[in-house]
Amino acid sequence: MRLAAVDIGSNTVHSLVADVVKGQLVEVAHYVEMPELGVQVARTGSIGARAKPAIRALRAVVARARTHGFDVLLACATQAVRQADDGADFARSAGDAIGTTVHVISALREAELSFLGVASRHAVRREWAMVDLGGGSTEVVIARGREMQRSVSLPIGSGVLASTYFSDPPKPEERARMRKAALRELTHAPDGEVERLVATGGTASNLPFVLTHRNPPPVLTTADLLTCEARLDRARAAQVAKTVGLPANRVKAMRAGIEALLLCLDWYGLAVLQISHEGVRQGMLLAYLERGNDWWR
């Protein structure tokens, strides 16, 4: 069976195509566009004029996914659409554009689906933490093995933080203000004596490639994160983008995302970050295999 998942996030729109082989997911293709809905929603409370470019981006990633063929297409929207005054209308228009229902999932369900994807590869027996750092929110889960113990959704997302606090490139005093604001929210994170922290989301999955495109590491130390921060801050985003091979808007978001990940490591008393390329899309597909059309509830 071949499945596809689309998620409309606060920074990005992704499509994933995967085969189901002996109950496991094997990735076939992955596509992404960056319509950045979260920044618009944070500023105005609605998606408004950003709806058309976002739906164009959605159509683009689904069209690329269709070239591989699939049996089922699942779609969800997260924080930006959840928060927007016109989110329900946007979700209906998005669903019409791609021919399937776009479910606006709750913050709890987003955390559960992200965890399902991450735990399929990274779960350990003892207590561990997952951080899904998105463009508009961060889901934090404390778990044992593949069982969620506690979770919370925090209003600290890389795209919104970057647009709120940073110029291009960020100044030291801007980073200090952003850290202070993010730390206020992080005090609501669930407590835990965790032995590992696993990060997923756009910042986390792209950071290894900022270090090196040849054998990007699956684990990053605090020193690695600080090296990435220095590389992303050394010039304007458009110039940095050419050297690291990422879009300029991604560079801008990652500048704030790194700061959030450093704060999370410090919060849990760790110095090493595990990187997961699995997340909400893999969780959507695994939930579909378990629960069929109720995967999003």
PLM ranges: what are they?
Residues 71-75:
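Conserved beta-strand/loop subsegment of P-loop NTPase cores
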Residues 13-14, 37, 112-115, 133-139:
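Short glycine/serine/threonine-rich phosphate/pyrophosphate-binding segments
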Residues 24-35, 68:
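N-terminal glycine-rich anion-binding loops that anchor highly charged ligand groups
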Residues 1-3, 17-20, 40-68, 78-127, ...:
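Helical "lid/coupling" subdomains associated with nucleotide-phosphate turnover
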Residues 2-16, 25:
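N-terminal amphipathic/basic leader segments beginning at the initiator methionine
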Residues 7-12, 131-137, 200-203, 279:
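A short acidic Gly-Thr/Ser loop motif
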Residues 3, 12, 30, 128, ...:
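Broad gene-expression machinery/nucleic-acid interaction feature
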